[in-house]
Amino acid sequence: MHQVKSFLLLAIDGEKMVVVNVGSCIGCRRCERSCPINGITFNEFPIKCMHCDRNPCLYACPENAIERINNKVVVIKDKCVGCGLCALACPFGAIRIDGVAIKCNGCYKRDVEICKEVCPTGAINNLEEILNNKIQNTVNKFNKLYYLYANAK
């Protein structure tokens, strides 16, 4: 029988995708408690901003209180009036209003996300690292790596 591993996409920033291995998440909520801006909502698994390329929250904000900084979508709290239009526009439900908009800022001032650092099971990881490890394991196992190219016409 094959073990099914499911991953939940947490954030996209153009360079990195942060994912949660739902099968490894033990629900300890360390990611939620460690977030300095309370940007993670935890139901059965953590829910964070996807930092999507289209930024519907950014365009919905009438006060220009949401900006893209270092490929992360960030709320500028001094500009936010808490109208909630960004939360309505977010397709992932990752923004909540508590006087002002609160969402994951992707730890844009850090090299590594805090939630990833504190996860005791390693359930939070960068997709690039996961894929690189899988590729390396395949190369090590078969000692060869084959590529299939499509004929583009």
Curated annotation (Swiss-Prot):
Binding site for [4Fe-4S] cluster 3: C49, C52, C57, C90
Signal peptide positions on this chain: none
Record has Transport as a keyword: yes
Short name of one Pfam family: Fer4_11
Every 4Fe-4S ferredoxin-type domain range: 16-45, 40-71, 71-100, 95-129
Cofactor binding notes: Binds 4 [4Fe-4S] clusters.
Binding-site residues for [4Fe-4S] cluster 2, renumbered to this chain: C35, C104, C107, C115
GO molecular function: 4 iron, 4 sulfur cluster binding; metal ion binding; oxidoreductase activity
Binding locations of [4Fe-4S] cluster 1: C25, C28, C31, C119
Cofactor(s) annotated in UniProt: [4Fe-4S] cluster
UniProt binding sites for [4Fe-4S] cluster 4: C61, C80, C83, C86
InterPro entries recorded: 4Fe4S_Fe-S-bd, 4Fe4S_Fe_S_CS, RnfB_subfamily
UniProt keywords, alphabetically: 4Fe-4S, Electron transport, Iron, Iron-sulfur, Metal-binding, Repeat, Transport
Superkingdom assignment: Archaea
PANTHER family: DIMETHYLSULFOXIDE REDUCTASE CHAIN B (PTHR42859:SF10), OXIDOREDUCTASE (PTHR42859)
Protein name per its UniProtKB record: Uncharacterized protein MJ0264
Organism (species): Methanocaldococcus jannaschii (strain ATCC 43067 / DSM 2661 / JAL-1 / JCM 10045 / NBRC 100440) (Methanococcus jannaschii)
